[in-house]
Amino acid sequence: MLKTTKKSLLVFMGVFFLIFGVDQAIKYAILEGFRYESLMIDIVLVFNKGVAFSLLSFLEGGLKYLQILLILGLFIFLMRQRELFKNHAIEFGMVFGAGVSNVLDRFVHGGVVDYVYYHYGFDFAIFNFADVMIDVGVGVLLLKQFFFKQKQNKIKA
């Protein structure tokens, strides 16, 4: 059991640092002036003071501390749920790497560095690579849980 947990922690850390590093590298390019415009997608610089769709922006500077508490609380919870952590180390690495990267932005830049603006046919919220990785990580985790439950139900029947 300890070996599996150690392996899962290494996988988690590898994915965490990969996602964190890629996200910060992209944001660095955006902060240095990289821009792109097209009929569908623009790359622009926006500092998001809230969370998804700028929600909770009224919390201003306090939001980053709330997010740190949330991240630490979830990490402590996961360390106590060894089986869950072992089965989803990659997904949790994606979510935590992206989440920590966005929180770092709040401390360094005063808001999350967002830059992808999709506007073909309708306006969509401006987002970043970390946001996508959080969505993908949570989506894969939910799909794996759903199919695992389906498999368990067939075994019981």
Swiss-Prot record:
GO cellular component, one term: plasma membrane
Pfam families xrefs: Peptidase_A8 (PF01252)
UniProt-annotated catalytic positions: D114, D131
GO MF terms held by the record: aspartic-type endopeptidase activity; endopeptidase activity
The keyword Membrane is annotated on this UniProt entry: yes
Enzyme category, top tier: hydrolase
Coiled-coil region list: none
EC assignment: 3.4.23.36
InterPro entries found in the cross-reference section: Peptidase_A8
Protein's cellular compartments: Cell inner membrane
UniProt-recorded name of the protein: Lipoprotein signal peptidase
Species this protein is from: Helicobacter pylori (strain ATCC 700392 / 26695) (Campylobacter pylori)
